[in-house]
């Protein structure tokens, strides 16, 4: 009983120390501004059944404008949800599957490897999915978020943002229209240093 609880508590502490050491190592060895970019609902839903729930053309235009010419890092499921690798960007897939191969994309099996593959790009973008965002959030410097002002049912979620560590740098609200049924905002958060 008590011994098992103690062992579990010690293991949690060791895991937390390992994570913090990994963060320090990554931030020391890679002088990059790591940027998360996502579209999320009010309840942090990213999508359902490996698809986006909404289609907001202005969000897609913004995504293309911001990520074009940069390395984009994503999980396998995100890559497989797209018809092909995104043009004009260095596509990097982070996966645990050592046998995985993909056309027009680089494969990484760890965060440091994904960042190394981003080369000399000082602004690699993390484009999803939920698990990948959770891995990169502790080392991210900026978040480019499209907040869809509605709740949705979904099975992929963006990690909750600890607002004590981030500052809202800019905000642009967009109202629904005939072609666009959702109110949404473009939000840029920067990490408090």
List each language-model region with its residue ranges:
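Enzymes that bind and transform nitrogen-containing heteroaromatic metabolites
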Residues: 25-193
């Amino acid at each position: 009983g008590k011994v098992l609880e103690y062992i579990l508590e010690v293991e949690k502490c060791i895991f937390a120390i390992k994570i913090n050491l990994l963060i320090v190592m990554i931030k020391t060895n890679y002088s990059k501004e790591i940027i998360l970019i996502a579209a999320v609902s009010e309840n942090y839903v990213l999508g359902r059944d490996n698809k986006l729930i909404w289609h907001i053309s202005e969000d897609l235009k913004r995504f293309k404008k911001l990520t074009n010419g940069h390395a984009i890092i994503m999980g396998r499921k995100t890559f497989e949800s797209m018809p092909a690798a995104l043009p004009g960007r260095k596509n990097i897939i982070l996966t645990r599957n050592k046998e995985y191969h993909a056309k027009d994309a680089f494969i990484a099996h760890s965060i440091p490897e994904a960042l190394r593959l981003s080369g000399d790009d000082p602004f690699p973008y993390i484009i999803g999915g939920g698990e990948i965002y959770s891995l990169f959030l502790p080392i991210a410097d900026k978040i480019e978020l499209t907040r869809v002002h509605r709740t949705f049912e979904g099975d992929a979620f963006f990690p909750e943002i600890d607002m004590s560590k981030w500052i809202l740098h800019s905000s642009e609200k967009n109202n629904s229209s005939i072609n666009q049924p959702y109110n949404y905002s473009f939000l840029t958060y920067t990490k408090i240093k």
